[in-house]
Amino acid sequence: MELDAVSRSYKRWAIYDFSFGKVSESPRRRTAAHVNARGGRVLEVGVGTGLSLPLYSHRVAVTGIDFSHEMLARAREKVEEMGLEPVKELRQMDARELDFPDETFDTVVAMFLVSVVPEPERVVSEMARVCRKGGEVVIVNHFARDKGPLAAVEKALARFENTLGWHSDFAIERVTADPRLEVVEQTPMSPGGLFTFLRFQRR
C-alpha cells in the first residue's frame, strides 16, 4: 500500500474516532493496561488521532509518532484539552525511518498499523531497533485467517485495500521474522477474535 493512498484514506475517514473508536476500544484498553503495568519509556508508532492516549498512566512517558499531519493535529488537541501528562511528545515521522537512537524505549507499541503501511517489515525492524534489549514490542492487528468462510471474504476484500485503507489478508508471518524479536504471546482479542495481541521480547 502506498503512503499517498494511506493519507487519502485517512482524510476520507472524517469520522475516524467515532467509526473506529468503538471497534478498537477493547484491544486498546488491554494494550494500554499491559504497557502501564510495565512502566518506563514508551513509543506508540502510528498514534493516529490519539485514541489510546487517554489510557496511559503516570507510570509511563509516551512518545507518539504518525505520518499523517491531520491525525497528529487531532491527537495534539486531545493532549491539550484533556491534560494528558504521560504524553511527552508527538512527532510527524515515517515509521520506516524512526528518528530515534538505538534502544531508546522500554516498550514499543503499534496498534492497528502494520497492515496499512508500506513495507511493514521495515516498520517492525525499526521498532526492534529503538526498543532496548529485554524490552517489549507489542503489535495489535488483524491478521489473515488461513481457513474457514471468513478467509475467503478477507481475500476478496484485499482487492480494495488502497480504497479502504485496510489490508484484510495480511499474513502474521510478515511481522514475526525479525531475529531480534522473540514471540512470547499471541492472544486473540475481542470483538470476536478480529484482532491479535502479539507480544515480543527484544533479544
UniProtKB/Swiss-Prot annotation:
Enzyme Commission number(s):
2.1.1.17
Q: Which domain of life is it from?
A: Bacteria
EC category name = transferase
Q: Name one GO biological process term.
A: phosphatidylcholine biosynthetic process
SUPFAM superfamilies membership: S-adenosyl-L-methionine-dependent methyltransferases
Which Gene Ontology molecular-function terms are recorded? phosphatidylethanolamine N-methyltransferase activity
Keyword terms, alphabetized: Lipid biosynthesis, Lipid metabolism, Methyltransferase, Phospholipid biosynthesis, Phospholipid metabolism, S-adenosyl-L-methionine, Transferase
Task: Note the CDD domains from the entry.
Answer: AdoMet_MTases
Reaction(s) catalysed by this chain's protein: a 1,2-diacyl-sn-glycero-3-phosphoethanolamine + S-adenosyl-L-methionine = a 1,2-diacyl-sn-glycero-3-phospho-N-methylethanolamine + S-adenosyl-L-homocysteine + H(+)
**Which pathway does UniProt place it in?**
Phospholipid metabolism; phosphatidylcholine biosynthesis
Q: Which Pfam families match?
A: Methyltransf_11
Q: Which Gene3D superfamilies match?
A: Vaccinia Virus protein VP39
UniProt key word Nucleotide-binding: no
What job does this protein perform?
A: This enzyme catalyzes three distinct methylation reactions for converting phosphatidylethanolamine to phosphatidylcholine.
Descriptive protein name: Phosphatidylethanolamine N-methyltransferase
Organism of origin:
Cereibacter sphaeroides
Gene label:
pmtA
